[in-house]
Amino acid sequence: MNSMKYRDLREFLSLLEERGELKRITQPIDPYLEMTEIADRTLRAEGPALLFENPKGYDMPVLCNLFGTPKRVALGMGQEEVSALRDVGKLLAFLKEPEPPKGFRDLVDKMPKFRQVLNMPTKRLFSAPCQEQIWQGDDVDLRRIPVMQCWPEDAAPLITWGLTVTRGPHKERQNLGIYRQQVLGKNKLIMRWLSHRGGALDFQEWCQENPGQRFPVAVALGADPATILGAVTPVPDTLSEYAFAGLLRGHKTEVVKCLSSDLEVPASAEIVLEGYIEPGEMAAEGPYGDHTGYYNEVDHFPVFTVTHITQRQNAIYHSTYTGRPPDEPAVLGVALNEVFVPILQKQFPEIVDFYLPPEGCSYRLAVVTMKKQYAGHAKRVMMGVWSFLRQFMYTKFVIVCDDDINARDWKDVIWAITTRMDPARDTVLVENTPIDYLDFASPVSGLGSKMGLDATNKWPGETQREWGHPIKKDPQVCARIDEIWDELAIFSDREPRR
């Protein structure tokens, strides 16, 4: 499956530069708003990753737009083409519900998957590049890092690509998650994690088991792309993100123990923040411009106290911005969409395609096409989408169409909605469901409704009327007109259209 081989972020950047996918910017650029403007224009033009080598006021380079095209997301997952991400999804579907070989031929077919599994265990190092430089105690100062302030009304600089490492009590497996972190001071950050996310759940369990005791946390900045992408991919609960990153990368993930706790962080990370969360210590977070295109509400989240900063020599700070799509999370969503399809098809073989339009904030609206087999089938599928993967917990709208509709063509989808739906019969409303905290349209923070649209052809039992059948052209006539089309010269002054 692998074709893009790299060991760490720096090696990945070198490979991108060889392909013309990385631009070094030597002019002084301000992390306050200017980097966002340049990155936004570059992303909208499907441009390269950006390495700002001279941030104003800092001596640490800033990397932006790393995942600014689906192609670079695929490369980060070890694939040359976006279409190959379906293979990543098939591998995840296999790992989620592995099946023993049915015979010798099946064993041969599955050997590549079994071979990849050999890269799953992590490799623990006693020393690592991420600990080449160490600051602790009073020497800790987050202001050395060129953290971007992305939008004019943002409350403060914001760490965006921090890979947060936690472990709940009595758990061997660590959790990796991407949570934004507002800079409060030289050694304080706000950890914005939602209550159902892995890090927040680990913290809740810790507080129950160890009341009043500090909760160890580590944040890796500038981890290798496979590890970052592993943290945002629907990895089975029995598989660690480090193990999955090893599968993507083609060799084992190397980790090292933190200086202040037993947590293990990526050995090649550019920067690592170590510290703790004091139970009960909270702070007001925000407002920040986010992926919806709006500034979000202010809310309270735990404070992360940093006791150690370790980093590589000549460290690179990896950052991004979030705003109205397209932004980097939206591009990431387009690429990960290809990973989701085989996972859903494993559970629901009737699904033909699944699409999360980026303009729907990457996850708030889904279009599903399916081979309908019985009355009520579309409603079963929409309920399945909402419940199967936690990534779709916040999907507000699910549109289900037949397999003659192209899920990725709005003209097709709108035609199906307007010709195959009766609003009262074919609309499903579900109230009091989990909703993204950033969704200010919901009546209560974190709780709102969902809508399912059954835009499939209706079967007996779903309608009492004779159902229409689509107009189709006569293929023989089409072939005849194809033969004489150029002679007709109808569009002689411009490109012919058929």
Swiss-Prot record:
Keywords: Cell membrane, Decarboxylase, Flavoprotein, FMN, Lyase, Manganese, Membrane, Metal-binding, Ubiquinone biosynthesis. It catalyses: a 4-hydroxy-3-(all-trans-polyprenyl)benzoate + H(+) = a 2-(all-trans-polyprenyl)phenol + CO2. Its main location: membrane. Mn(2+) binds at residues 175, 241. GO terms for cellular component: cytosol; plasma membrane. Binds 1 prenylated FMN per subunit. Pfam families: UbiD, UbiD_C, UbiD_N. It is a peripheral membrane protein. It comes from the Bacteria. Its EC number is 4.1.1.98. One of its GO terms (molecular function) is 3-octaprenyl-4-hydroxybenzoate carboxy-lyase activity. It is an enzyme of class 4 (lyase). InterPro entries: UbiD, UbiD-like_C, UbiD-like_N, UbiD_bacteria, UbiD_Rift_dom. It is found in: Cell membrane. Its cofactor is prenylated FMN; Mn(2+). The active site is at 290 (proton donor). Homohexamer. Belongs to the UbiD family. Catalyzes the decarboxylation of 3-octaprenyl-4-hydroxy benzoate to 2-octaprenylphenol, an intermediate step in ubiquinone biosynthesis. This is 3-octaprenyl-4-hydroxybenzoate carboxy-lyase. It comes from Pectobacterium atrosepticum (strain SCRI 1043 / ATCC BAA-672).
